[in-house]
Amino acid sequence: MVGVTPQSGKPRTLAEKVWDDHVVRTAAEGEPDLLFIDLHLLHEVTSPQAFDGLRMAGRRVRRTDLTLATEDHNTPTGYADPSFNTRRGELLTIADTVSRTQIETLRKNCAEFGVEIRPLGDVNQGIVHVIGPQLGLTQPGMTIVCGDSHTATHGASGALAFGIGTSEVEHVLATQTLPQSKPKTMAVTVVGELRPGVSAKDLILTLITQTGTGGGNGHIVEYRGEAIRKLSMEGRMTICNMSIEWGAKAGMIAPDETTFDYLSGRKHARRGADWDAAVAYWKTLATDEGAEYDTEIILDASKISPFITWGTNPGQGAALDGVVPDPQDFLDEVERGAAERALAYMGLTPGTPFRDVPVDVVFVGSCTNGRLEDLRAAADVIRGRKVADGVRMMIVPGSYQVREQAEAEGLDKIFIDAGAEWRFAGCSMCLGMNPDTLSPGQRAASTSNRNFEGRQGKGGRTHLVSPQVAAATAVVGKLAAPADL
């Protein structure tokens, strides 16, 4: 029977359906299930030790056809970097020894074990969580893992996707399975509609601030409701991408016509009768009426406004219309202490209007907001305007293909004319593992997903924002929304 477990007939959630369909072996009570993994994504940072483990044990990669690697974390993205040929963006050499070694090691491991890789210069190279959906590899009802915290991005398609550790990467490479204890489930129902000028990034930052960075607490979260249904696939990916930032195991959105339209015709999407059969199955994945979640949260989209973070974790945020909070206003002693430390690091004074906070750098990119729709949103704001004096604006497409599509639409010219840097694909300034970093004391408005101390460079100060707020901030030179222009 479609939509219920054969054993009990109990209504099931989206997460439970996908989980149940992938259980290879159910162990004794209290022991983890063994799940089959449909897609395993790799990058250069968390895979070297896993391949070493295979080599030492004399094992092979069990399903190379379900495994894909790309180079993203350590890759330089700028024309000025000697690593690039400015004509094609090919990797020639990387100055940093560790970064160079990790990329060279990934290439050698993929060649030795027969794993497909998308290296720099490849038309399908890019951030791992951008190229998966882009290629049509990410599909509803799949289980997807990667040695990366933001694997939940793929849940926007109705897949069960989550990050794993290096030892688990080795286990999946060797067996195409993974022992997992079944997490609790949570529903986040977003009622109403987002107002004009308010984005998916504002929504997820608001949710994280309201619930705290532990609000998801290991749950598989299903995002639902009118506001979620009206989001594009790119917006849904932004939501699911940041699930880990409030403690969730994974984030999922049930597939619908928006999902099918996005996936149709992509390189790895099915064709003809196979496509029709797949869509028929995907339509059964929606949560059954009467299914129960362990926890439920309701959020009113109409009350959300442009949002930013002021502290050193994604849960320390506020509406842009507000002011820097006073730690003394926090009733909880732990939160009060965390706020004091965060403001000291960020160099902010309580009571300062956020719109009076100047920035040095604006970064548009990452697996959170580096897709074509994100670049379009930023371009719409900055079109015909100029980046403020003293501000550096970096536009980093999430993939080579996104870059080409943006150039075909003339977005690169809009950014360049405004005084921004138009760069190659990569994780870039999201994290300080490549040449794109902040200097100590520099302040950035960033469309990435983490604002931890030193995340974008030692001593760097990060405010998480949407692409629209990022572009407006670049023009004003201070934190700003498009309505301020």
UniProtKB/Swiss-Prot annotation:
Superkingdom, natural source: Bacteria
Polar residues composition bias: residue spans: 439-451
EC number in record: 4.2.1.33
Residue sites binding [4Fe-4S] cluster per the record: 367, 427, 430
Required cofactor names: [4Fe-4S] cluster
Cofactor note: Binds 1 [4Fe-4S] cluster per subunit.
UniProt keyword terms in alphabetical order: 4Fe-4S, Amino-acid biosynthesis, Branched-chain amino acid biosynthesis, Iron, Iron-sulfur, Leucine biosynthesis, Lyase, Metal-binding
CDD domains: IPMI
Gene3D superfamilies: Aconitase, domain 3 (3.30.499.10)
Keyword presence, Iron: yes
Region ranges (Disordered): 439-462
Alphabetized InterPro entries for the sequence: 3-IsopropMal_deHydase_lsu, Acnase/IPM_dHydase_lsu_aba_1/3, Acoase/IPM_deHydtase_lsu_aba, Aconitase_4Fe-4S_BS, Aconitase_4Fe-4S_dom, IPM_dehydratase_rel_enz, IPMI_cat
Keyword Amino-acid biosynthesis part of the UniProt annotation: yes
Reaction it catalyzes: (2R,3S)-3-isopropylmalate = (2S)-2-isopropylmalate
UniProt subunit comment: Heterodimer of LeuC and LeuD.
Family: Belongs to the aconitase/IPM isomerase family. LeuC type 1 subfamily.
Protein name, per record: 3-isopropylmalate dehydratase large subunit
Gene: leuC
